[in-house]
């Protein structure tokens, strides 16, 4: 697809280290004008996507992919700030409740920001500082 071919996105696959099993995909856009990283796309593999599978094989895939966006933001010198657009109202509420996301735009209630303490907490749960 054209989306996968976009050079302006950093694309990552999340795998289980022991088996190489693919469990999620993420695409991230550097937004220097906003001093943050936009999480363009994150998706769990079908077997771990609660919408598709009901019972998930693995939990925390989306959170780990968000944490990776926070890592990119830190690497770019943005302090961990990320924003994203929730696909559904349920996912929006999940990000607000569980990850400390805050609405980013009055025009689009699905645009959310994860920054500051919320970003540090999410990062520390899933990734380690080097």
Each language-model region and where it sits:
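Conserved short alpha-helix immediately C-terminal to the canonical SAM/SAH-binding motif I
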Residues: 65, 90-91
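Non-catalytic substrate-recognition and accessory regions of acyl/acetyltransferase enzymes
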Residues: 1-56, 71-83, 87-90, 97-130
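Glycine-rich acyl-CoA binding loop
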Residues: 58-69
């Amino acid at each position: 697809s054209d989306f996968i071919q976009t050079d302006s996105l950093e694309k990552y696959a999340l795998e289980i280290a022991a088996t190489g099993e693919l469990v999620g995909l993420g695409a991230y856009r550097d937004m220097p004008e906003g001093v943050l990283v936009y999480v363009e796309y994150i998706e769990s593999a079908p077997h771990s996507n609660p919408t598709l599978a009901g019972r998930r094989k693995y939990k925390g895939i989306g959170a780990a992919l968000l944490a990776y966006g926070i890592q990119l933001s830190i690497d770019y010198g943005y302090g961990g700030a990320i924003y994203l657009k929730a696909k559904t109202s349920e996912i929006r509420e999940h990000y607000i409740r569980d990850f400390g996301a805050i609405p980013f735009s009055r025009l689009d209630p699905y645009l959310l920001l994860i920054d500051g303490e919320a970003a540090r907490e999410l990062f520390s749960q899933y990734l380690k500082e080097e």
